[in-house]
């Protein structure tokens, strides 16, 4: 997993509560277990005017010009802001894969569905929780002055707007370490490779019959 590096990006405001995983990546696109290739279908039903199909070239599909991701100022955004209960619905990890594949590295919301929240950390996406008053302020900032940027500093646990407003967020130390060092479940397991090998060797000595090739 790629290490999380502090960065500055335009903010993508999606002023909705209860954005579910089927809205993030519709069910018809869940046929692949690869983590890439989902970005074109992120928010597919909101982003396009037609019904998308798996494997379809999205470059010629009719766009919904009112949707935020189709507006030029927001297309390169890496920070998404929404309201409470983001990522609710089914537990598909593809939802985080789609956000990550599009380029979004941080989501800021009032709250999250638990499974989605934990899936973010396993895929290099930072889910920030802010009080509803702070979320309101971010949407008001966009409404008042248009597109704005934020600096995301995971080391200091701050999100700072280009006008200098600083928002501090809480973060579990272990999850923070995993993001900063790029550690997913496999990488965490491989940190104990020596202990695992030693255990396997010991078991082969203690119960050798468990390791016999029964196909012969």
Predicted regions and their residues:
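Cytosolic catalytic domains that perform sulfur/thiol-centered chemistry
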Residues: 1-83, 87-115, 119-216
């Amino acid at each position: 997993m790629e290490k999380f590096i502090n960065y500055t990006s335009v903010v993508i405001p999606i002023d909705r509560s209860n954005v579910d995983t089927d809205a993030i990546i519709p069910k018809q696109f869940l046929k692949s277990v690869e983590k890439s290739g989902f970005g074109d279908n992120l928010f597919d039903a909101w982003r396009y005017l037609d019904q998308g199909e798996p494997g379809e070239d999205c470059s010629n599909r009719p766009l919904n010009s009112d949707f935020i991701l189709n507006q030029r100022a927001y297309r390169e955004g890496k920070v998404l802001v929404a309201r409470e209960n983001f990522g609710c619905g089914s537990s598909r990890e593809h939802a985080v894969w789609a956000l990550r594949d599009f380029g979004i590295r941080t989501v800021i919301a009032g709250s999250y569905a638990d499974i989605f929240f934990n899936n973010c950390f396993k895929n290099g996406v930072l889910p920030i929780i802010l009080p509803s008053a702070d979320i309101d302020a971010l949407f008001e900032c966009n409404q008042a002055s248009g597109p704005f940027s934020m600096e995301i500093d995971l080391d200091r646990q701050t999100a700072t707007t280009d006008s200098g407003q600083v928002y501090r967020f809480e973060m579990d130390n272990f999850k923070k370490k995993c993001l900063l060092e790029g550690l997913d479940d496999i990488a965490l397991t491989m940190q104990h490779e020596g202990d695992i090998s030693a255990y396997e060797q010991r078991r082969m000595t203690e119960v050798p019959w468990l390791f016999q090739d029964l196909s012969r």
